Amino acid sequence: SSDIPEGMFEDPKTGKPMLLGTIGIEELQQDPFDEWYQVESDAYQVDTELTNAISDPGQYTYEVFLGTWCGDSRREVPRMEKIFSEMGIDMANVLIVTLDRDKVSPSGEQEGRDIRYVPTLIVSKDNQEIGRIVESPSSETATLESDLFEISLGIPPVPNYSDIE
């Protein structure tokens, strides 16, 4: 007798619905995830000066690993989507994988990707990873946009792993 909608999984820690596996961005924009998704998306102002400075953002492949149960994912992923949209990246071309609390997806998309924290955004060119943003921007003064810009310049920032999860 579970209230978990079809296609979703129960978070063993909270009993709330969570997504697992590869999803489309629209799945985050519907109940029950839309309440946090929409708020964050609406509030975020994209730094268009920086996104416009990224040369040919379409030459890169983007993969987002997140947990719908994770506060950092709930904050950063709606922002990432807004940034991709500003850069003219079709979200259908962004691989979005939702993970459980052990950072695992049922089909194993995370294997070999060294996903320690969520969200993790991996940027690749010609099938080679050129940078990643892990959990949040790389420093107090960095933004998702500045980290993406640095990755595009070939100087990927070192991820800012926090001490606590």
What are these regions (language model features)?
Residues 2-57:
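N-terminal leader/targeting and pre-domain segments
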Residues 18-21, 117, 122-164:
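Non-catalytic, surface beta->alpha helical segment in thiol-disulfide oxidoreductase systems
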Residues 53-88:
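Local sequence-structure signature of Cys/Sec-based thiol-disulfide redox active-site neighborhoods
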Residues 62-68, 91-106:
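Thiol-based oxidoreductase modules, predominantly thioredoxin-like and allied folds used
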Residues 73, 104-106, 131-132:
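Extracytoplasmic/secreted cell-surface and envelope-processing proteins
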Residues 75-84, 94-97, 109-110, 134-136:
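"Short basic amphipathic alpha-helical interaction patches in structured regions
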Residues 102-116:
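Short Fe-S-cluster ligation motifs
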